[in-house]
Each structure stands twice: as structure tokens, then as C-alpha cells.
Amino acid sequence: MAHERVVRCASGALVALAGLVAVLPAAALPPEENQSWVELGAWVNSDDSYKFGDFTGLEEKGISLLANFDVGRRAVWDSGDVRWWRAQGQNLGLDSRWARGDFGYQGLFDVWFEYEEIPKFQTDSAITVFQGRGTDRLTLRPSWVASSTTAGFGALAENERDLDIEHMRRDVRAGFGLDLPADLEWVGDYEYETKKGLKVAAALIGNTGGNPRTSLVAEPLDYQTNEGQTALRWNGERVQLQLGYEISVFNDSNDSLTWQNPFSQVGGWQAGAGVGYPTGFGRKATPPDNSFNQVSMAGGVDLPWNTRISGDAAFGWMRQNADFLPYTVNPLLDAAVPPPRGDADAGIDTTAATLRLASRPIDHLRIDANVRYDDRDNTTPRDVYLYVSGDSLDQQGIGSDRARLNLPNSYQLVEGGFEAGYEFFERTELSVGYQRQEIERTYTEVDQTTENTYEAALRSRPLSWLQARVEGSYADRNGTEYMYRSPLFGGFTPEYVGSITDPDELFENNPLLRKNNFADRKRSRVLGRIDLMPIDALSIGLDGAWVDDDYDQSTLGLTQREALSSTIDLSWTPIEILTTYVWFTYENLKSDVDGRSFSNAAQASDPERDWFERDEDHVYTAGVGAELHLFDDRLRLRADYVYSMANTDIEVGTGEALTPTSRNFPDVESRLHDFNVSAEYQFRENLAFRVSYLLEDLKSDDWAINGVAPDTISQVLGLGEDTPHYRN
């Protein structure tokens, strides 16, 4: 279906109670500041919708408990009681619940505890033919009929089962703060996070050309992350110091995902090795266990002439030593040479330091300066890996293109700059700045990049009802010689490189291709905002931003990128009890990518084999709303409406040697209407009733998802999912 319609409705009625204050007589109340409140009620959801429930927890039709609270006690400042506590909770009846508790003695210590759940609902319209969902081994039913392409899957329909892709993140956090003698303070916190559920993964079997076959499958998630940090602080009158330590440990309960190959034998797969169905299996590693530790220092000192110097330094180490999997799960493939070691013994040592200066030496003048150093030393040892391509081919020798060396990339960054501003008129400042960044890298096409950025800004408030600012910058990034042969010489064995007799074939990527994070680039940026309040009841804001990236030395790759956005917002209070607002935002994003299709050196230099892609996004978003207070503020009415329209245009074209010579993809479109209205009535000081209603209507059209059945693509067994939709 070209357009999927989403209509989401939810309504909630709640009663807000004032907790302790509501049940104690006034004379019994302690002399404290108490603004506690409790909300109780119900969410009524009109229908099931994964899209509506994404992050909110309102994915199912029916009634859910609405429960929020914020209760606590803190004595008035002169009571002599230094105890305080606070308890908070939100969405307690939903899968997006959050709760926190704090307790402390002011000036002595405080402790806190926090719990949070975050649901992620990706799709409930997927289809799978695999058994064992949620486990690390996926198999096919005995009734499966294999083929070399999806068109021949004769038993596809009878093997299809519904598949929901979702996961839940749960976080438990705790922390403390302890005031010590001599202006010392000790703080710390700890977080334990779990992530369980499913995500979509590409399960590939094959090795080159047209023989790879892929199945989109459900990969199980069972992650645990432990993070902790602590710091000792000294807060002097003019000097502040801090010494800290932090640790992060990630664990994955699964080390791999194994799946049965639904495709029959394909040309290019190892003959006689049972690669195809039913004996063929594939296996991929899941994220490995790893850890990170860091020791840090920070401090600041106040100097004469209204000057302050601050800085920080950190030394860290990352480690990853999860066991390697065998090269292949297929026992009939020849893989006699094992990996060169049992694990990667991977490590990265980090060193970072920053020094900042902020000074106001004379009236109307400010000077800010900074220097930053960031070094990442990848200590992972290099080795030759005789990998088996996609569980489909016998292991090849040291002189083949299947013998690869890992590239432990390191970098060293040094940057510094300044900004100086002078108020040459009252409440009007002109500032200029300069920033220089140098990055040295290893095992990349460019050894060093240098970027110079020039900045200027004007900020002014010439009148009490007018405020404006405009900022602009120009950055020029240049690199040393682009060594396009670097991936070949660094990633392949000398034996293989030596077997290439034609110098024109000594490359892995096209010699004219430039990776955009290394390529020469000129970046222009302008942004501004104006705020007006011509009368007390009316405020108007206008802002805009434009960024243009020009990769003028890139023949192939990303050559141009541009982003434009503008917003106007207006707020009007015609009478004291009524506030209205309206706003509109437009965003435009463009990118140009040029490429070349080739399979040999002659084609790599043929411009008639060029292709291009031009993407352009248009996003229009508007909103209007009002809030009305009646009956001495006892009745509060609120209404909001938001409309958003997004279009993506994709234009492609090719040279004369390729077909088709010109073709545009269908536009990707979405339309969203969001209407929210609520009414709240205050029966008495500590009791209120509120009812709210939300209506959301979404239409979307994405050619890459809608209408793509599991067997639409001949070499890919898909999930057949739709764009998120809900129908009333």
C-alpha cells in the first residue's frame, strides 16, 4: 500500500493529591517548605500501536495506570533541622517508568537511588521463517523448500510466522555525596544497565560477486553494562581541584549468532562442502565483552585582572580480549590454519588534556582561549588472518586476497584558539575568533589533516524590546597527500601485493575516491536570531542557520553537503487569562555523492561508468496552541496542534556505459498531525481533576519498506515489514 495511515488516540483522567498536606490538619503541619504532589488516574489507549508505544510504553490497547508523584521534605532555612528527603516517580503504570529517591543532611551528606525503564518498539509487522527466535541459534522447519533465489522458496508462505522486534533497557543507578573537613567533598555514582530483546541483523553467506545470499534475522540482545565513577574535590576560595576515576564494563551473554542457510547451493560456493540448505550454516560474532578505565584530574584558579585559568587531564585504557570464534562454523570447509591468537588482545590507551583561559582585563573587553590535546594509541597487535569468506569457501593461502591484516588506527589531535569580544556600544559586542586543529593518524589514507577556522559574531540589545545576534565562520581543512593505495599495502599481505604485476591495479578503492572525514573541505556557516517584544503582550522570534560543506578536491565520494533551517515563533497574551502561540520551522538538507562502477583497472578510469546521487530533504513543521485560565485560575484549559510534513527527493543518474542512464527513486514522504487538549479543575488547594485527549494521525510512504515482501529481492530473504502504522 502506498500510504500507511496512523491514527493514535489516548486519553487520561487523573486526580492530583497533595499527599501529606491533604491528610494533616493545618495546626499539625511542621514549619517546612512542602510542595509535594501525587497524580493518580488512567490512560485509555484506543488501539495497539508500536509507534505510539516507542519509548512511551503505550503500545497496547486498553487502560493503563497513570501514576506520578513528587513528595519530599526540606525544613525552612532557619529551623535548625538539616535533614531533607525527596521521592519522585513518573509513568509508574507504564513500561517507561522512572523513580528516584534522595536523602541527606544538608552540609553533611546525601545519597540517591534511581530506576528507569526505556522500551524500544521497532516493528510488529515483520515476518520470519526461522525457529529459535530469542536464542543464538536459528533453524528452519523440516518443511522448508530451498532455492538459489527467493523466487524458488516454494514453502515460504506456510513457514512464515509473525515477528515483533523490540527490546527493553533497564537502568539502576545510585550515588552519594559526602562533605569532608578542609573544604573537601567526595562524590560517586554507579549504574547497572541491562538491554534485552531483539534487533534486526543481516545474516550473510557468500564470498564475492553475485553469490552472497542474505537473510534478515532477529538477533538476540542480552547486554549488561556496569559503570561507576568517583571523585574527590577540594573547593578553595580561589582554587578548585578534583581527582577522579571511572570504570565501564560491558558484557554480552551471547558470543555469536548461528543460522541455517535457507538457500540451496550457489555457483561460487565451495562444492561438496554442504554450504547450501540443509547442511549449511552461517555464524557471526556479537559485540564482544570489553572494559574502559580512566583516571582524571581537573582544576581552576582565579587570577588578578578578572582572569580564570582552568584545565583537565585524563588517562584511560580500553581493553577487549573476548575469545575469537573459529573461522567458520561449517565443518566441511577446509580451515586448517586457526586464527593467529586466541583473542584480539585489543587495547587503546588514551591521553587527553585541555587548558582554558577566560579573562575580562578591562571594561567591555573579554578574551577566551583554549588548547586541547587528545591522543589515542591503539596497541592492538597486527597479524595475518586467513579468514573464511561468509562460511562459503575453503581457506585460502597467504598470497590470496583473503589473507588480511588488521589496521589498529591511532590518532593524535592538537587544537587551540581564541575568541575576543569588545562591547563598543552599550549592550553591543563584536567578537572575532580563530581555531586551529591538527590531527595525525596511522593506517589511513591521509597522515595529517589541518583545519583553520575563522569566526565572527555580533550580539546586540540596542533597545529594551529588541535583541539580535548574528554569527559566521569559515573553516578550511586540508590534508597531506591522499595515499589511495594505503588500504591495499596496509591491509593485505606482501605476498598478495607482490602478485599484482600491473601497477595500475595497485588499489582497493577507486584512486579518485575520497573519504569525507579525511578529504579537503571548505565549511561556511552563518546563523542568527532576532527577538522582539514591541508590546508587553507580544513576543516574536526569528532565527535561521545555514551550513555548507564543499569537498572541492573530491572527484568521487561526498562532494557537497548543505543544511538550511529557519524558524519564526510568536507568543501573544491579549488578556491576562489567555496565552496563545504559533510557530513554523523549515529545514532543508542536501547532499551530492559521485561514484564509479568498475571491476578492473580499465573501468576504474572510465568516466562513462560514473554515477551520481542527489538527495534533498524538505521538512515543514508548524504548531499553534493556547492556554486559558478561568474562575480565578481554578479552571485551566490547554490545546496544542502540531503539523509536520517531510519529503525526501532522491535523484540518480549514470554515464553512457551504464544502464539506466537516468532514474529517480520515488519520494519518501510522511505527514503527521498531532492534537492535544486538556482541562484541569482545582477543586481546592490540594485537590484537582484533569482530563486530556491526544489524537495523532500519521501517513507515510517509503518505497524501500512498503511493498517489499520477504521474497521481493532475489538474493535477500527479507522481513516483509511495513512502515509503522495503526488503523482505527
Predicted regions and their residues:
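Bacterial N-terminal signal peptides that target proteins for export
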Residues: 2-13
